[in-house]
UniProtKB/Swiss-Prot annotation:
Function, as annotated: Plays a role in the establishment of cell polarity and epithelial lumen formation. Also plays an essential role in ciliogenesis and subsequent Hedgehog signaling pathway that requires the presence of intact primary cilia for pathway activation. Mechanistically, interacts with and mediates RABEP2 centrosomal localization which is critical for ciliogenesis.
A Pfam family of this chain: CCCAP
UniProt feature coiled coil, ranges: 119-173, 203-258, 323-695
Xref: InterPro entries: SDCCAG8
Protein name: Serologically defined colon cancer antigen 8 homolog
Keyword field contains rRNA-binding: no
Polar residues compositional bias, start-end: 45-67
Keyword Coiled coil applies: yes
Length: 701
């Protein structure tokens, strides 16, 4: 990019130099045509000047209104047209205005934070400078009109001198243009020697400026010498005029004294006649001398008036030229000040641009480091999270498989328990039917016993002793039955404890499902043993009941007296059996309720496990979604990195474009300053021509 920028800058500089040379050639041609042209009368300059002022006042540019230098020049022109006395007061005002302008310019220097708006306002500033240049050109046209008036007055006497001076100036400018064109071609061909060519060009311009300054100084010295000689001539003429005036007065006084002396002296007639003749002749001589002196006096007065008028005109012209030179010098000083300010601002802008570019490069490098670090950190974190998620997914899948196996086992155990409960319920129904049959048989037997009661009463007395023994045996049997019932209760309590253990083990399926299975197996064995014991007990009871029935049938036939006791005993036995059956039913119901509770708890646990499974699946899906989001974020980070790179490239391009704009503005300012210098040189040349014209006028006078 750097060589392309340098080539663009060189091309722009070449184009600016071409435009400057073209403008210089145009100004020289215009000056030559102005000097060669003829104007009919000096009065035409005043209306032209008024028209130019009116046009400037009617068609002001917006940037010119904002310029203080332009407003000062306009006020000076208005002051010139209104009154000549105000011109003497104008320099101090201009100096004060120039000081205010410089103070305002120094106070309005931008800071570092206003760099971007100043760069944006450079185009407006260039338009403003162009407007000032245009106004200076208009002022030059006005000056040219004034110079044209002077040239028209002295055209007949100094035509040859003007032609020679014009030819010399044209030769000098054409020589300068040819050298500049050669240098421009050398710049285009040899871009590497741009600095040396510019230095040589500046050196040549400085030499030409020094030559022009020498010429201007010589012309000013000659004009000053002419003014001094004219002043001396005027003083001599005034002295001669005074001397002639005194002589005339003296002669008049002598003539008056002679006339009065002749009248007073008394003479004779002859002497008086002789004196009268002499007096007439002498009076004629005196009258002639007086008339001659009066004529000389009138001529001298006319010459003096003309000299005074020419002196006043020369003074006025000198004062106008002085004011114009002063204005041009002030404008040149303002232009130099603006140039220095612009150069300082441009250097400041260049430094700020370099600083901003370095700062942006540093920020870009730091941001790239941060982005790379963040990318590496995000990659490491994403890898760690992926590994953790894979581990959690594997562990969760293992847990889900284990829980599925546990659920299958729980369902199998539940099905087996349900089948066992159904079998127990069937057995209980069978036992109830058997007990109902036994009760019916016992009732039938009781009815038969009641029928045989009367017969048994007879045998009661005989069998009372036997019944006592049998009662003792029955009590022993009741005690045995109580012991058996306590054993059954203990077994039931053990079964309840085993069920509680099984419930606790079912609650802790993850810790000891195998233990619960063993305990369930043990409880099944105990339950089967208890059922077998119950069946054996029932069989034993039925056998005992049958045996007792047989004994009762044998004893009832023999002992009617013992019938009531046996009935009571049988009622007690029936009540005990009913209570036992009820207790067994209650225990069966409690066992069924406990089994249902266990089933419900197992179902609740299964539901909890299913919910946990769903929750784990949801968490796994969330983790998967998070992994996908992390991957998308990684992709977005990469895209953001690309966008940041593009943005940084755009910023670099913008900085380069802004630097190019600044270079263009600098070249434009340089061009405008060169135009101002050319305009000042034109002013100096015109002033020198004016002084030369005045000198020739004075010499002609």
């Amino acid at each position: 990019m750097k060589p392309s920028l340098e080539s663009d800058e060189e091309e722009e500089l070449g184009a600016l130099q071409k435009t400057l040379r073209e403008r210089a050639n145009r100004s020289i041609q215009h000056l030559s045509s102005m000097l060669a042209g003829h104007s009919s009368d000096s009065e035409t300059s005043e209306p032209n000047q008024q028209e130019l002022l009116s046009s400037v006042q009617q068609n002001p540019c917006s940037p010119v209104q904002q310029s203080e230098a332009v407003s000062q020049l306009r006020s000076l022109l208005q002051m010139k047209t209104k009154d000549a006395n105000i011109q003497s007061l104008s320099p101090s005002r201009r100096k004060l205005a120039a000081k205010r302008a410089t103070d305002d310019g120094s106070s309005s220097q931008p800071g570092v934070h206003n760099l971007v708006p100043i760069i944006n306002n450079q185009s407006e500033y260039i338009q403003h400078l162009e407007a000032e240049v245009k106004f200076c050109k208009e002022e030059l046209l006005e000056m040219k009109q004034r110079v044209r008036v002077v040239i028209v007055e002295n055209e007949k006497l100094h035509h040859e001198l003007k032609a020679k001076t014009i030819e010399d100036t044209l030769k000098e400018y054409t020589f300068v243009d040819s050298t500049l064109n050669m240098e421009h071609t050398a710049e285009n061909t040899l871009k590497e020697r741009l600095g040396s060519v510019n230095q040589a060009e500046d050196h040549k311009w400085r030499k030409e400026m020094e030559q022009l300054k020498c010429l201007y100084q010589a012309q000013t010295e000659t004009l000053e010498a002419q003014v001094v000689s004219l002043k001396k001539d005027l003083a001599c003429i005034q002295k001669e005029y005074e001397e002639s005036k005194e002589r005339l007065r003296h002669k008049e006084a002598m003539a008056v004294a002679a006339g009065t002396g002749q009248r007073v002296s008394g003479l004779c007639l002859k002497c008086a006649q002789h004196e009268a003749v002499l007096a007439e002749t002498h009076t004629n001589v005196h009258v002639q001398s007086i008339e001659r002196l009066t004529k000389e006096r009138d001529e001298l007065m006319t010459v003096l008036c003309s000299l005074r008028a020419s002196q006043t005109d020369a003074q006025q012209r000198e004062w106008g030229a002085y004011q114009q030179v002063k204005q041009a010098v002030e404008m040149a000083e303002e232009a130099n000040l603006e140039k220095t300010r612009a150069l300082v601002q441009c250097e400041h802008f260049h430094n700020e641009l370099t600083r901003q570019r370095e700062r942006l490069e540093r920020e870009l490098a730091s941001e790239q480091d941060k982005i790379s670090q963040a990318r590496e950190a995000a990659r490491s974190e994403s890898k760690k999270e992926r590994e953790e998620l894979m581990q959690t997914l594997s562990s969760l899948s293992q847990k889900v498989a284990e829980l599925q196996g546990l659920l299958d086992r729980g369902e199998r155990d539940r099905n087996s328990l349900n089948s066992q409960l159904e079998e127990a319920y069937k057995k209980l129904t069978v036992q109830e039917t058997d007990s109902s049959k036994m009760c019916a048989e016992l009732r039938f037997l009781l009815s038969q016993a009641q029928l045989k009661k009367e017969e048994a009463e007879r045998d009661v007395r005989d069998i009372s002793s036997k019944l006592g023994r049998q009662l003792e045996l029955a009590e022993q049997e009741v005690q045995k039955l109580g012991v058996e019932l306590s054993g059954y209760r203990q077994r039931l309590e053990e079964a309840q404890r085993a069920e509680g253990r099984a419930r606790a083990e079912a609650a802790g399926l993850a810790e000891g499902l195998s233990r619960a299975q063993r305990q369930l197996h043990l409880t099944r064995q105990e339950k089967e043993a208890s059922e077998r014991c119950c069946g054996e007990d029932m069989a034993a009871l039925t056998f005992q009941a049958q045996r007792r029935e047989r004994e009762l049938t044998q004893t009832l036939q023999q002992m009617e007296a013992q019938h009531e006791k046996s009935v009571r005993e049988t009622d007690a036995l029936l009540s005990a059996q009913n209570s036992l059956i009820r207790k067994l039913k209650e225990e069966c119901h409690t066992l069924g309720a406990k089994l249902e509770e266990l089933a419900q708890s197992s179902r609740a646990e299964m539901e909890q496990l299913s919910l946990e499974r769903e929750h784990l699946q949801e968490s796994a899906e969330k983790l998967r979604g998070r992994c996908e989001e992390m991957e998308e974020q990684c992709v977005q980070h990469g895209r953001m990195h690309q966008r940041m790179k593009q943005r940084l490239q755009q910023l670099d391009q913008h900085c380069q474009a802004s630097s190019q704009q600044v270079l263009q503005l600098l070249s434009r300012q340089k061009q405008l300053m060169q135009e101002r210098q050319q305009l000042t040189e034109d002013l100096h040349s015109l002033k020198s021509q004016v002084h030369a014209g005045k000198r020739m006028d004075r010499l002609a006078v």
